[in-house]
Amino acid sequence: MPAACESLLDDIEDIVSATDPKPHDRQNARQNIVPRARKRNKNKIQEEEPPADSTIPGTQKIWIRTWGCSHNNSDGEYMAGQLAAYGYSITEQPEQADLWLLNSCTVKSPAEDHFRNSIKKAQEANKKVVLSGCVPQAQPRQEYMKGLSIIGVQQIDRVVEVVEETIKGHSVRLLGQKKDNGKRLGGARLDLPKIRKNPLIEIISINTGCLNACTYCKTKHARGELASYPVEELVDRAAQSFQEGVCEIWLTSEDTGAYGRDIGTDLPTLLWKLVEVIPEGAMLRLGMTNPPYILEHLEEMAKILNHPRVYAFLHIPVQSASDSVLMDMKREYCIADFKRVVDFLKERVPGITIATDIICGFPGETDEDFKETLKLVEEYKFPSLFINQFYPRPGTPAAKMEQVPAHVKKQRTKELSQLFHSYSPYDHKIGEEQHVLVTEESFDSQYYVSHNRFYEQVLVPKDPAFVGKMVEVKIFEAGKHFMKGQPVQDSYIYTPSITKPLAKGEVSGLTEESKPPNNPESLLQTSREGLQTFFFVTALLAAVIAFVGIKLL
């Protein structure tokens, strides 16, 4: 042990010599130090300005562009509502906006092309850009999205965070899924603020994702597996919308027929609960449903579609009348299943409108396959038919299949379109008196648009007294996609809304206390004053710390 101590002492003596000052010598020496006064500019501290307005989140103008389905439009409404509630100004003029929020659709190639072109335009105009929707969710590593912020389809409740960081110059990407105890949720909360594109219509997404794995579909890559919202949350959302003057509800999802299979319930159960809260005269429209899942509930669905507050309308995509093509598509039904659904509903729900979709030129489709599809349309004469020329979507199995030549796809699309336009679905209704619900203005601004019991479009005179009302009209003209009606003299105009609708652009779900200031300058002034106080306190604190440090020397 003594040897070890001697060794340690030798090491210390190598470092500290006998001539070095001792600790008490260092303390005495400090007394002879004269502190040098630091130059301060008190005026500079007090007059220091906060950053420019463009860097203060919550004061900018935002333009939102949405492509695609009702589900995507609902997401866009929710994002607009949250941004407006935070203080951002939502503008319909893209050139005036500081930031573009582009909400994309991946169903068809042309929609993605428009999305990509809009990104380019935004960058050329030196706009901040945030991307959302199915395209960036499904393929976020595309070169044209490099360096841009992305909001995932299940992360729309965090749009304010993403926009805020983007305005500050950062790139943010939130693409994760929402889960509860490991179980995937339907998405963002349904009670979030929103700005309805049409204050009279509430779009409710009842579930996200689906149970199928169609070989041509890119949406599955973005929306994923089925995840349904609880019945009570959907009913609460519907009830709230009626309290805000809504008179029509659209239920939407990638497949409404599959609703509830992941949470132990089903679509009829939800619909019966919803009709309990629908005011008299208000209407509910059911969204797209695939044949396999509605087959199990035909009896109940027929009863619901006969309900006076539910449109006798159903969108059932068939895609092809060839079983071999349906098998290649992995549609999980045969043409006999589709016909069974349609025939049953036509019998049990007199006058029901059946809308459907058809893809022309799917890989492997022969002339005989296509003739089967033509025969189906000829037999049922669908009043609403969405005809789509096949586009291979990158990353889908169908893109790797042997393709039908482009000129053949175009010819088949043209032939089917000609067949569709060869019959008039509404001529027999001329002279009928119908009750219609008026909800919007026509594209040419010449008429108001309404829908009858079967969700058939009826154009009525542009009388402001009709908006949001149930009106009785007499049909005097019929076109391919619409009818025209004249109000019946002395008929009663019914108001289904239980309260005055929100103004266009007004945020849903906000109390008076939580609404943003009407004057953007007041918000800006508050931000400036807060920042000025912050900077002054920070500078004062730094000065105190410096003074204390000097005293301790």
From Swiss-Prot:
Cofactors (names): [4Fe-4S] cluster
Domain MTTase N-terminal: 60-168
Membrane topology, as annotated: Single-pass membrane protein
PROSITE patterns: MTTASE_N, MTTASE_RADICAL, RADICAL_SAM, TRAM
Disulphide bonds in the chain: none
Domain TRAM: from-to ranges: 427-489
Pfam families to which the protein is assigned, alphabetical: Radical_SAM, TRAM, UPF0004
EC top class named in words: transferase
Protein name according to UniProt: Threonylcarbamoyladenosine tRNA methylthiotransferase
